[in-house]
Amino acid sequence: MTDTIFAPASGFGRAAVAVIRISGPGAASCLTALTGHPPPLPRRLSLRQLRDPGTGEVLDRALVVWLPGPATFTGEDSAELHLHGGAAVRAAVLRVLGRLPGLAPAEPGAFTRRAFLNGRMDLTAVEGLADLIDAETEAQRRQAMRQLDGALGRLVEAWRDTLLGVLAGAEAALDFSDEGDVDESALSASGLAAAARVRDAILAALAEGRRGERLREGFVVVLAGPPNAGKSTLLNALARREAAIVSPIPGTTRDAIEVRCDLDGLPVLLVDTAGLRDEGADPIEAEGMARSRRRIEEADLVLWLVPPEGGAAAPKGALVVHTKRDLGRDPGGGVDGALAISALTGEGLAMLLDRVAAAAGAALGRGDAVVTRERQRRALEECAAHLGRAIAGAETMPAELVAEDLRLAVRALGAVAGRVGVEEMLDRLFSSFCIGK
């Protein structure tokens, strides 16, 4: 990483201020070239005229910040240019930066990649930063901040340090098995007890289920039922906008319509599906119903809407919702947990939202999960499996195999933090960041 990179760190629309980030060994010379002066005092905003070094033309009067490494986001010498936010100003400065020797435009995620490679962040913190950028609800923000602050990273580092000590003892016992000063029985008692504690802690973290992963993805609520049960009307009422076409003609909804919403700080994905009936459907509607059944199977919660004239039996586990209460008929809401609502008047919607929020909260938690990605889960499961084999085989397996399981357990924890075996994944992860991050 000998080159110096630059990129806008703010949005591209018209704004009061536009920020450009610079990172790398040429950051100081870049400031000197633009301002005609040495870098200002570190970590202070300083007003400077920015000029094109080739022509002397004034580009902008801007606030500049000089951030000498390694105590920076990337771990390198860095600088920021706080420009007036017009598109022409930003474009002119970027054009001049691109002509300076040794400078190159940053790829998406390039600044964060440098922070990771320079040891400023581990991989769990990088993933937390990505989740924070994508967070749409309070619970997602809270979970992302915990990861960014090192909730999982600190645990993994502590577990890894413990296992490295156990492994060192096991390897010493192997290397010096003929020496009398190596207490193999003490290693077996204390070392394997420590390994068991780490394994139990990992299993406890995994016992949370997939709450962290599901919180990132959202709680999927599928609106299902017979045609003309009021699914699209309910979707529009919950979304507070006309997301779906509403028509008295059966079969209007042919494909699933998805709407993301924030429900009590939790991410919820509402899915309006094609109405289900046994006969009279054309081929297109039949395909829509097949897709509806697949979405029902994949849902976290199914709201089974029943119109006043009734309909088919609800799938197992579905929340039955009697619709069109405004027509004045008594659907018997409240029996066996069923609800009665009117999407037109709003009657019963608050109670329905409370039920959905309770189900989402039970499934997702409130951002306190430690494991938030499938990659993390798989590595921790692998570590626990190796530790389980080492502990179970301590008395029966050859010592070399026990030590090998300990080595593989340490390696699996290293993968969680990004120390080993993550090269291919890094490109995918960093490409999901915006330019300038």
UniProtKB/Swiss-Prot annotation:
GO terms for cellular component: cytoplasm. K(+) binds at N228, S247, I249, T252. It is found in: Cytoplasm. Pfam families: MMR_HSR1, MnmE_helical, TrmE_N. Binds 1 potassium ion per subunit. Mg(2+) binds at S232, T253. It is an enzyme of class 3 (hydrolase). GTP binds at residues 228-233, 247-253, 272-275. Its EC number is 3.6.-.-. (6S)-5-formyl-5,6,7,8-tetrahydrofolate binds at R21, E80, R120, K437. PROSITE patterns: G_TRME (PS51709). GO terms for molecular function: GTP binding; GTPase activity; metal ion binding. One of its GO terms (biological process) is tRNA methylation. Belongs to the TRAFAC class TrmE-Era-EngA-EngB-Septin-like GTPase superfamily. TrmE GTPase family. Exhibits a very high intrinsic GTPase hydrolysis rate. Involved in the addition of a carboxymethylaminomethyl (cmnm) group at the wobble position (U34) of certain tRNAs, forming tRNA-cmnm(5)s(2)U34. Homodimer. Heterotetramer of two MnmE and two MnmG subunits. This is tRNA modification GTPase MnmE. It comes from Methylobacterium sp. (strain 4-46).
